[in-house]
């Protein structure tokens, strides 16, 4: 007989290991927690490691917020070799032994070109779609598609270390940034080509690698300890301003939007009712527009 699955609500932040797909992590976690409903917040390639938030129950409503949030990565780029996928899992398509002499000054000059608002072309080996078909499938079929460039923001780009044919960087970036494309572009800017050989996501939204859980360690926990590892839905918005409703404002917020003269409000706002987190709203031009509602029970519902 199938075990009744639990209606869990919240977020578990996993430190994904190399070789596992994001969907495999999702299925393992769903099994470990015996959860009814679960979803991840954007894939990490199997070769990548690091922060992968998994949403349970009502938290799946806000997965898009995490998908759209800023990210931070540690990336290692191998110079002088290009691959069709832009990473170590692809086929080698070009080699160039003429790697320039790398110095801190030279690398900083090149990296400066990639800081701030830039235009990036996503890699063909990606889940983006063209006429309903994932680009990676078209790439495997040998079909060349013109991929549209997109505007992204590299907030921080720090050189961590380098040697004669590789460099390690820390990248803090906006949604939609492909680190493989960044590796390719940096290789081109250095005149020798390059590809990504290691990638660790160290932050996704408010969640950092320091507090992420290893799957193997999670397996050894008691079920009560597993439940205690679930972060509340509210934790996704912990850095957002708060607005506390009074009774006469509820109807306006729920139905039409609420005008609120509050200078501290901006963008996404946490809504409280009787000291309980009940919704998120967007504040724009003096008006709160509700976006998502949540029940009071954040963890387990009967």
From Swiss-Prot:
Disulfide bonds: none annotated. The keyword Transport does not apply. It is an enzyme of class 5 (isomerase). It comes from Francisella philomiragia subsp. philomiragia (strain ATCC 25017 / CCUG 19701 / FSC 153 / O#319-036). The lineage of its organism: Bacteria, Pseudomonadati, Pseudomonadota, Gammaproteobacteria, Thiotrichales. The active site is at residue 45. It catalyses: uridine(55) in tRNA = pseudouridine(55) in tRNA. Keywords: Isomerase, tRNA processing. GO terms for biological process: mRNA pseudouridine synthesis; tRNA pseudouridine synthesis. Responsible for synthesis of pseudouridine from uracil-55 in the psi GC loop of transfer RNAs. This is tRNA pseudouridine synthase B. The keyword Isomerase applies. It holds the Pfam family TruB_C_2. Its EC number is 5.4.99.25. GO terms for molecular function: RNA binding; tRNA pseudouridine(55) synthase activity.
């Amino acid at each position: 007989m199938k075990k009744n699955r639990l209606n869990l609500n919240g977020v578990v932040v996993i430190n994904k290991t190399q070789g596992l797909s994001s969907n495999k992590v999702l299925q393992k976690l769903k099994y470990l927690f015996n959860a009814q409903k679960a979803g991840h917040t954007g894939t990490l390639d199997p070769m990548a490691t690091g922060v992968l938030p998994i949403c349970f129950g009502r938290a799946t409503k806000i997965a898009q917020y995490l998908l759209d949030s800023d990210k931070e990565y540690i990336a290692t780029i191998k110079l002088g070799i290009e691959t069709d996928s832009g990473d170590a899992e692809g086929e080698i398509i070009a080699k160039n032994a003429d790697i320039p002499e790398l110095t801190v000054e030279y690398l900083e000059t090149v990296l400066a070109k990639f800081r701030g608002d830039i235009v990036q072309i996503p890699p063909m080996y990606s889940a983006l779609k063209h006429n309903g078909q994932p680009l990676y499938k078209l790439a495997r079929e040998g079909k060349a598609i013109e991929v549209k460039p997109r505007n992204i923001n590299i907030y921080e780009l720090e050189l961590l270390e380098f040697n004669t044919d590789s460099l390690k960087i820390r990248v803090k970036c906006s949604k939609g940034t492909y680190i493989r494309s960044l590796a390719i572009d940096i290789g081109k800017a250095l005149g020798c080509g390059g590809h990504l050989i290691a990638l660790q996501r160290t932050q996704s939204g408010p969640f950092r690698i320091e507090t992420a859980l290893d799957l193997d360690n999670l397996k050894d926990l008691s079920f009560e300890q597993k439940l205690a590892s679930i972060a509340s839905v509210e934790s996704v918005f912990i850095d957002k301003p708060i607005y506390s409703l009074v009774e006469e404002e509820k109807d306006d917020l729920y139905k039409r939007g609420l005008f609120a003269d509050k200078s501290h409000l901006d963008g996404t706002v946490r809504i409280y009712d009787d000291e309980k987190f009940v919704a998120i709203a967007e504040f724009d031009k003096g008006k709160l527009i509700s976006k998502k509602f949540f029940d009071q029970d954040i963890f387990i519902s009967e």
